[in-house]
């Protein structure tokens, strides 16, 4: 796999080890030399848009925001932005020269900006307010996972956010969970949350066998986000096959989804989960009668 594609799958940035789980050393070296991947610090790599955001913000006299700010803070995102996002003060006009950036307008307090980037809490709430639910949830999960923001802080900030976008911010804040391992799992959970009758919990322990990426304990449904990242070795593949078999022996129905389908065909994933909930509910009702 190409190194830039690997970073896209990882959420826009990753450690050297994470990248090399998906590609080769030669491919990573070549991508860095070509400028398609940048090295942020020792052992950490990102897509070039991460640095481009600061350059664009300085050129526009604005502030790095939304997904660009999330990447700046080291959080993984569902899908890295094609162009950096910059927020300008409401009175500020765009310069006549063309700048490669998505521009939005908002008045930011001094405390909400750190070194030209929206502060961590403002970044999470902005993403929750303005981005689609899966994208906002992935950022919030990542922020919680990193320890940079707490659940209580996020809920308080969402509750006190401006009326426009507040319902979306509250939805993300209430659903956010730092146990979600990566943006792939966050995006899958965002879809599952919208399925009637399905109530999932991330990284749910099943007996002594292991953890399911997502699980509905009441219905006995285990949902797995399948990625080459975690099947890079034969032993990892064997482990997961045995784990799924053990789940089934404990009366769990295992449903597995590919990254491509979760990211690009969410309506299909939603339809499958809806069918699985219906089938499992019917089966449980028959068995109980």
Q: Which residues fall in each region the model found?
A:
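Short gly/ser-rich loop at a beta-strand->alpha-helix junction or flexible surface loop bordering the NTP-binding
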Residues: 1-165, 277-289
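Surface segments flanking catalytic/ligand-binding clefts of nucleic-acid enzymes
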Residues: 23, 144-289
């Amino acid at each position: 796999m190409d190194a830039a594609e690997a970073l896209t799958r990882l959420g826009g940035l990753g450690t050297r080890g994470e990248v090399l789980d998906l590609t080769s050393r030669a491919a990573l070296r070549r991508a860095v030399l070509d400028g398609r991947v940048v090295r942020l610090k020792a052992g950490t790599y990102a897509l070039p848009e991460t640095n481009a955001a600061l350059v664009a913000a300085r050129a526009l006299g604005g502030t790095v925001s939304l997904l660009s700010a999330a990447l700046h803070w080291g959080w993984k995102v569902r899908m890295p932005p094609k162009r950096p996002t910059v927020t300008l003060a409401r009175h500020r006009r765009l310069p006549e020269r063309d700048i490669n950036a998505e521009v939005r307008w908002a008045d930011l307090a001094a405390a909400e900006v750190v070194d030209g980037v929206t502060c961590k809490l403002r970044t999470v709430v902005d993403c929750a307010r303005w981005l689609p639910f899966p994208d906002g949830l992935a950022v919030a999960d990542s922020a919680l996972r990193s320890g940079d923001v707490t659940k209580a802080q996020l809920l308080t900030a969402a509750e006190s956010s401006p009326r426009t976008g507040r319902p979306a911010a509250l939805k993300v804040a209430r659903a956010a969970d730092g146990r979600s391992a990566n943006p792939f799992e966050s995006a899958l959970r965002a879809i599952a949350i919208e399925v009637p009758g399905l109530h999932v919990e991330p990284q749910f322990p099943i007996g002594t066998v292991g953890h399911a990426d997502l699980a509905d304990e009441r219905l006995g449904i285990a949902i797995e986000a399948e990625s080459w990242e975690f099947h890079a070795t034969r032993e990892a593949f064997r482990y997961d096959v045995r784990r799924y078999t053990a789940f089934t022996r404990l009366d769990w129905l295992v449903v597995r989804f590919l990254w491509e389908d979760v990211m690009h065909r969410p309506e299909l994933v939603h339809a499958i989960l809806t069918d699985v909930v219906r089938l499992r509910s019917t089966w449980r009702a028959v068995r109980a009668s």
